[in-house]
UniProtKB/Swiss-Prot annotation:
Keywords in alphabetical order: 4Fe-4S, ATP-binding, Cytoplasm, Iron, Iron-sulfur, Magnesium, Metal-binding, Nucleotide-binding, RNA-binding, Transferase, tRNA processing, tRNA-binding
Binding site for [4Fe-4S] cluster: C120, C123, C211
Entries under SUPFAM superfamilies matching the protein: Adenine nucleotide alpha hydrolases-like
UniProt family annotation: Belongs to the TtcA family.
Catalyzed reaction equations: cytidine(32) in tRNA + S-sulfanyl-L-cysteinyl-[cysteine desulfurase] + AH2 + ATP = 2-thiocytidine(32) in tRNA + L-cysteinyl-[cysteine desulfurase] + A + AMP + diphosphate + H(+)
Organism for this UniProt entry: Pseudoalteromonas translucida (strain TAC 125)
Motif (PP-loop motif): 45-50
Enzyme Commission number(s): 2.8.1.-
The name this protein goes by in its record: tRNA-cytidine(32) 2-sulfurtransferase
Lineage start: Bacteria, Pseudomonadati, Pseudomonadota, Gammaproteobacteria, Alteromonadales
InterPro entries reported for this sequence: Rossmann-like_a/b/a_fold, TilS/TtcA_N, tRNA_Cyd_32_2_STrfase, tRNA_thiolation_TtcA_Ctu1
Length: 304
């Protein structure tokens, strides 16, 4: 590689890193994910998303105006062929607090789920319970997961298509028992950016198919649909994500979100009256997450 090519590659990496850091910081601020004195359990699976999340949170810890702790937890589920040495070696080099939790959920899942069927749902429930228990044992105030913007959009359509709900994956979530706060710092980050960043950084990726489970076909088809839209209609994915942040309950059909029953004349409805008009659809999709100028600096974030 020539000197100019090296310089260009470094410039692109710096630009990508700044974008991911900026988007992570913005999500943390928008959803008040991290507060003074938090002890955050970073769930590291060995995939590209969780490695990138740890990188982003470590940077945020260095530059944030508040103090908080990070510690890493990995769940070794005893899948055949799981490279047990990879994560300890990586984390030792980072000099970060971590714990490897060993739980043989693989045997439990394979005993219950017929061969050839997807095990992801049961595996996820078992994993969640173990992580909640570990968070409590280790005094975590927040649990950080590596889901990104594309995961959230895919989940929105999966729930609409197969669950009959207008529901996605929230950037911040309270567990059902009210004991654990889950945060997703990469909520504003694109999967393509994360993939590129993880590749350039050379993270020791552990494949997610060690269990031999079939990929969730519904999610696979939804991902393919969104990829096709993105290729054919640039900006559509960004517009969908923007829509998730601009909900108008009075223009949907959920009586629990908006009191249609007691709606009276003389009231001003948020979102405007379009009952007799054609909806005002912009010709160009809203793209709130366009790449900013390459020279832009990382946003300074007040997390207090």
């Amino acid at each position: 590689m020539s000197h100019s090519d090296q310089a260009k590659a470094q410039f692109n990496l710096t630009k990508l890193q700044k974008r991911l850091r900026r988007q992570t910081g913005q999500a943390v601020m928008d959803f008040n994910m991290i507060e003074e004195g938090d002890r955050i359990m970073v769930c590291l699976s060995g995939g590209k998303d969780s490695y990138t999340m740890l990188d982003m949170l470590q940077h945020l810890k260095r530059v944030a105006p508040i103090k908080f702790e990070l510690f890493v937890v990995n769940l070794d589920q005893k899948q055949p062929g799981f490279p047990e040495h990879v994560l300890p070696q990586y984390l030792d080099k980072l000099n970060v607090e971590y714990k490897i939790v060993e739980e043989d959920t693989y045997s439990i899942v394979t005993d219950i789920i017929p061969e050839g069927k997807t095990t992801c749902s049961l595996c996820s429930r078992l994993r969640r319970g173990i992580l909640y228990r570990t968070a409590k044992e280790l005094g975590a105030t927040k649990i950080a997961l590596g889901h990104h913007r594309d995961d959230m959009i895919e989940t929105l359509f999966l729930n609409m298509f197969y669950g009959g709900k207008l529901k996605s994956m929230p950037a911040k979530l309270m567990s059902d028992n009210g004991e654990h706060m889950v945060i997703r710092p990469l909520a504003y980050c694109k999967e393509s950016d994360i993939s590129q960043y993880a590749f350039v950084q050379g993270y020791p990726i552990i494949p997610c198919n060690l269990c031999g489970s079939q990929e969730n076909l519904q999610r696979k088809h939804t991902k393919a649909m969104l990829a096709k839209w993105d290729a054919e209609h640039p900006g559509r994915i960004e517009s969908i994500f923007t829509a998730m942040q601009n909900v108008v309950p009075s223009h949907l059909a959920d009586n629990q979100l908006f009191d249609f029953t007691n709606l009276q004349t003389g009231e001003v409805i948020d979102g405007g009256d379009i009952a007799l008009d054609k909806p005002d659809i912009p010709k160009v999709p809203i793209n709130s997450l366009q790449d900013e100028d390459a020279s832009a600096e990382v946003v300074t974030i007040n997390l207090s």
